[in-house]
């Protein structure tokens, strides 16, 4: 007989949906260990603006893959998959269940389905692309991508030089488009995965929570935290860390764009848009059980029932 696959739990959801609170309750009741699935929580020194679990919450439920990088560093879906698999193996070896909690859907997808065989970065080709962009502009580079790979060009904005450069680089290295290569599946996740998404039933409730969270962040010192990053000489607005919602709007404010109140308003709007994209992605997700964030007891019961099924 084949050995049964180890269990794993995905706890997904839009920002401000109550994922952390539910994860803490789950850890009290089940033999689980938490792994963060969040492209912002990986950064050190970015605590308030990312709504990182506080010291008390981390004491109740330690999260792996939090505070692992400096904001100068980049972190890909491939990096996450590698690190998450290592942490999952370690948790299973302890006789526990990995509980992956967060809202970065691309990370979940990479972990669940594996990654396409994309070529490694090539510094020479990347430098050549950047030189062309300096000469002709990123709009012209985007037009070039439209000719080569219209599907990727539709998804990638001309003002996103990192992703635009990568799409062109992939084609120049491999002779295949990013669209072609991403259709090739990688290794599937060797776990029995139970997938849940938590959200309030009403969209207005998400909006209310986002506004409340932003108000709390400002009271806790988000402006000072963001300014400390801005005053570093090794950070700039195009880094993935600084493109995180909230930080980007504060950065623009420090650059002289509008008032602090306007920056906060833009941050709230950007966070709402993020939540909307997360919900749209989750609605297309297969084999997903939805949980009501206003009924934690009911959510715990649903999770318990599903875990005991197999």
Swiss-Prot record:
GO molecular function, one term: tRNA dimethylallyltransferase activity
InterPro entries, per database record: Dimethylallyltransferase (IPR039657), IPT (IPR018022), P-loop_NTPase (IPR027417)
Location of region: Interaction with substrate tRNA: 38-41, 162-166, 243-248, 276-283
Domain of life: Bacteria
Enzyme class: transferase
Catalytic activity, EC: 2.5.1.75
Site keyed Interaction with substrate tRNA: positions: 104, 126
Binding site for substrate: 15-20
Entry cofactors: Mg(2+)
Catalysed reactions, semicolon-separated: adenosine(37) in tRNA + dimethylallyl diphosphate = N(6)-dimethylallyladenosine(37) in tRNA + diphosphate
GO biological process, one term: tRNA modification
Residues bound to ATP: 13-20
Keywords on record: ATP-binding, Magnesium, Nucleotide-binding, Transferase, tRNA processing
Complex and partners: Monomer.
Job of this protein: Catalyzes the transfer of a dimethylallyl group onto the adenine at position 37 in tRNAs that read codons beginning with uridine, leading to the formation of N6-(dimethylallyl)adenosine (i(6)A).
Family (UniProt): Belongs to the IPP transferase family.
Protein name per UniProt: tRNA dimethylallyltransferase
Source species of the chain: Aliivibrio fischeri (strain ATCC 700601 / ES114)
Gene from which this protein is expressed: miaA
């Amino acid at each position: 007989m084949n050995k049964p696959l180890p269990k794993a739990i995905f706890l997904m959801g839009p920002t401000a949906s109550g994922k952390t609170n539910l994860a803490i309750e789950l850890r009290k009741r089940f033999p689980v260990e938490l792994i963060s699935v969040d492209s912002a929580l990986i950064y050190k020194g970015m605590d308030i603006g990312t709504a990182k679990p506080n010291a008390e919450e981390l004491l109740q439920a330690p999260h792996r893959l939090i505070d692992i990088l400096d904001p100068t560093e980049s972190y890909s879906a491939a990096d996450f998959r590698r690190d998450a698999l290592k942490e999952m193996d370690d948790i299973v070896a302890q006789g526990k269940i990995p509980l992956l909690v967060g809202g970065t859907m691309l990370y979940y997808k990479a972990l669940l389905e594996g990654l396409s065989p994309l070529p490694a970065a090539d510094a020479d080709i990347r430098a050549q692309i950047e030189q062309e962009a300096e000469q002709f502009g990123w709009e012209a580079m985007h037009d070039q991508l439209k000719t080569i790979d219209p599907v990727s060009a539709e998804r990638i904005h001309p003002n996103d030089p990192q992703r635009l450069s990568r799409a062109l680089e992939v084609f120049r290295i491999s002779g295949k488009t990013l669209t072609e290569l991403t259709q090739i599946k990688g290794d599937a996740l060797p776990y029995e995965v139970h997938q849940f998404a938590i959200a309030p039933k009403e969209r207005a409730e998400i909006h209310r929570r986002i506004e409340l969270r932003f108000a709390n962040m400002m009271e806790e010192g988000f402006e000072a935290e963001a300014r400390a990053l801005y005053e570093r000489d090794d950070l700039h607005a195009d880094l993935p860390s600084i493109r995180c919602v909230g930080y980007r709007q504060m950065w623009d404010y420090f650059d002289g764009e509008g008032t602090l109140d306007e920056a906060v308003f833009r941050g709230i709007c950007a966070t709402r848009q993020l939540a909307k994209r997360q919900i749209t992605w989750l609605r297309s997700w297969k084999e997903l059980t939805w949980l009501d964030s206003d009924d934690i007891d009911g959510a715990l019961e649903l999770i318990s029932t599903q875990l005991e099924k197999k």
